[in-house]
Amino acid sequence: MSITKDRSSPSSTISSNYQSPVATHSTKNKVNIAKMHPDKTFAKILLHILSENKKSKDYYKKINSNQDGHFTFKMKPGISLLDYLARILKYLKIEYSTLIIAMIYIDRICKEKVFLNEFNIHRVMLISIYMAYTYNEDCIYDNKYLALVSGLSKSEMLSLEEDFLDLIDFRLFVSEEIFEQYKKYFFRDILDNNN
């Protein structure tokens, strides 16, 4: 399954003209919840954005500038994005709606010039999921527990949370209209395979 599926979708290169990969997608199909694989879909969307970023001529220059502060590792993590996501989902028991909200948050911080790359994509994903989880569900886990699950220290988690909230200007609210737009995009591969 490909994210693009022969559709003309905008480039997800993170720059001042960043456009969400959701922006041009629309569908009238209904979601078949029994056939969902939200973890794989979520990871594929992030990997698609990452692959689009790699096409940018400024990609390696932006990696070397280390402009993303606490989001950026000094070395590439030794765990794949999908394995890291699977670990988070295993211990946090997250609803698919939370992953959709996390995707909205990732778009918001990318619009604020966070350039997704191999050095920051794990942390951007982690903090976006955690903030969506905190906002969307009855959060029973604290930063200490999430630090244990994520492999980061509690102070790193607090720093990520502060940076994240600053970047999105504390805009955690997601309207129903925006949520539905992202939900349709999120399940596009599943819907395409059912047709």
Model regions: which residues?
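Short alpha-helix boundary/capping motifs
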Residues: 128-131, 156, 192-193
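Contiguous, well-ordered alpha-helical segments that form the cores/surfaces of helical PPI scaffolds
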Residues: 100-108, 122-134
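Short conserved catalytic/interaction loops centered on acidic-Pro-aromatic/His motifs
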Residues: 115-121, 135-150
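Channel- or pocket-lining gating/hinge segments that regulate access to a cavity or pore
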Residues: 144-187
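Residues that form ligand- and interface-recognition hot spots within folded domains
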Residues: 46, 129-134, 150-153
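Amphipathic alpha-helical interface surfaces
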Residues: 98, 121-124, 156, 160
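Acidic, Ser/Thr/Pro-rich regulatory low-complexity segments at or just upstream of the first helical elements
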Residues: 1-97, 101, 105-115, 158, ...
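Extended amphipathic alpha-helical regions
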Residues: 133-136, 185
